[in-house]
Swiss-Prot record:
This is Leukocyte elastase inhibitor A. SUPFAM superfamilies: Serpins. Keywords: Cytoplasm, Endosome, Lysosome, Phosphoprotein, Protease inhibitor, Secreted, Serine protease inhibitor. Disruption phenotype: Mutant mice do not differ from wild-type in growth, litter size or life span when maintained in a specific pathogen-free environment. However, they have increased mortality in association with late-onset failed bacterial clearance, and specifically increased neutrophil death. Mutant mice also show a severe defect in the bone marrow reserve of mature neutrophils demonstrating a key role for in cellular homeostasis. In addition, Serpinb1a-deficiency leads to maladaptive beta-cell proliferation in insulin-resistant states. It comes from the Eukaryota. GO terms for molecular function: serine-type endopeptidase inhibitor activity. Pfam families: Serpin (PF00079). The gene is Serpinb1a. One of its GO terms (biological process) is negative regulation of interleukin-1 beta production. Disulfide bonds: none annotated. Belongs to the serpin family. Ov-serpin subfamily.
Amino acid sequence: MEQLSSANTLFALELFQTLNESSPTGNIFFSPFSISSALAMVILGAKGSTAAQLSKTFHFDSVEDIHSRFQSLNAEVSKRGASHTLKLANRLYGEKTYNFLPEYLASTQKMYGADLAPVDFLHASEDARKEINQWVKGQTEGKIPELLSVGVVDSMTKLVLVNAIYFKGMWEEKFMTEDTTDAPFRLSKKDTKTVKMMYQKKKFPFGYISDLKCKVLEMPYQGGELSMVILLPKDIEDESTGLKKIEKQITLEKLLEWTKRENLEFIDVHVKLPRFKIEESYTLNSNLGRLGVQDLFSSSKADLSGMSGSRDLFISKIVHKSFVEVNEEGTEAAAATGGIATFCMLLPEEEFTVDHPFIFFIRHNPTSNVLFLGRVCSP
């Protein structure tokens, strides 16, 4: 499980960097876990350099028996009985006249719980699009009503892979609504906006990375299996969002080191955190292309013959939509698709005032998997 969670986190950080290049000061929010799961289903049917490029980009080449690892991980992450709701849903929508190999369909069903829904892309692509959107809307409790916009599928579409993830968790320590006030949030050294700032003082795992001048706070959700971890620069020191130094230095090893429970101290923290809601939509072709996935999107080069027995399939688009809402009660989120740090001695009480841009992620603690990763520059 550890190999897979490292692979997923490594991919998460690399994708974050390409999204950051496209939008250096905008909000970012996505589910690396959802994207990795969806592309792992593609690898099941990929051959040759198509498969090799995918394995390398997603770092699956360092994981033994990738598909059964995903099977265990999906079961572990979405097991029933937890005090939060975390739902993973996979489905393949295939052109009904097209012959997919029974072995491929059996494998995606067994490893990813993804069944094939036959639809009529050829004669009724708009109906097929609506059907796919309806299903995703149901799986994400209405938070992602339109995964595929008009024109994304047409009569030439053979296959749409859909992966949706939905999370709703209550804070272990809730914020009281009466403590929420209007407060300024600094977007940069020059600009501010007014936000609804929540407040509480409780004991939380807290750390300070001195060489980065960055505070780390972990806020667990009820049940303790999931946490939100926030990386907050002490101040805005660059001419942009204040996050440039962290974004430059962040690696898999450093992130694990900075945010490990044993490196944080459980102390009283005055937490001020804005309410926020972010919805993002990405077509990931060019981002994945920059990370090394080339052949998959090319009708002449893609080899998905493990899905159909022939070489006429390729993936035209990978669309990922995500949603997160953080308030006094907790968090609702959905998505469809080193150096050792030196920690400082802390005071008995710390201030954690999130009044400028920050990076956050939602982690499944038992497996250390990053389910969602984001940056808030403007809540």
